[in-house]
Design a protein with these regions (language model features):
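S-adenosylmethionine/decaboxylated-SAM
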Residues: 69, 80-183
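N-terminal pre-P-loop "Q-motif" helix
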Residues: 75-79
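Generic signal for short, ordered secondary-structure residues
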Residues: 65-66, 74, 88
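Membrane-proximal basic amphipathic "stem/tether" segments
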Residues: 1-70
Length: 183
């Protein structure tokens, strides 16, 4: 019963926050439109959560659900909406992710660019290993590179250009310098 009670209370809280947003919610707003309201960060987050539930394309929602399963990725629903709004507005030609876990962000960028029909060349720098930082714990039994490839295949997306090393390695520094990045 505690789990059900928590879900109900969370949903009531979510609806209350949606109601208090000082904007028109009958149609999706672009990032530029959203900025004109001068919302604080919390309200922007709440709008992204609202956008996820009411306006985000089903394919992007499915992407989120896929990465929630088996802890394939981190973050919250609102982050998928945030990336959608950012890429919709910025339409980056070259995007770089530094530190790939299992490919959630790079597949999301590619998926959104496919949905919005613009070309985005995605690259990444990552050792694709269980080596972590002082706050992260990674599973040793996962081949992170193969898992990232599998996740790209699941969404029928090509693999990005990969620099397979730590971001502090000279090879990574040269890789970053070799291109002009939009994101």
């Amino acid at each position: 019963m505690t789990g059900l009670k928590t879900k109900i209370l969370n949903e009531l809280s979510r609806q209350w926050h949606y109601y208090r947003l000082p904007l028109e919610k009958s149609h999706p707003l672009t990032l530029s439109e959203l900025r004109r309201f001068g919302l604080d960060r919390t309200s922007q987050y709440i709008y992204c959560d609202y956008y996820f539930r009411h306006f985000l394309p089903a394919e992007v929602k499915k992407h989120r659900q896929y990465f929630i399963q088996d802890q394939r990725g981190f973050g919250e629903d609102a982050f998928h909406a945030m990336w959608f709004l950012l890429l919709q507005e910025l339409k980056p030609k070259r995007a770089l992710e530094i530190g790939v876990y299992r490919g959630q962000t790079i597949t999301l960028w590619k998926l959104i660019s496919r949905i919005l029909q613009f070309e985005c060349s995605v690259s990444c720098i990552s050792p694709f290993s269980s080596a972590g930082d002082s706050v992260s714990n990674y599973k040793n039994e996962i081949d992170y590179f193969e898992d990232t490839k599998k996740n790209h295949l699941y969404f029928n997306l090509p693999m990005p250009e990969v620099c397979r090393c730590f971001s502090t390695d000279p090879q990574a520094v040269e890789f970053i310098k070799s291109k002009k990045w939009d994101l």
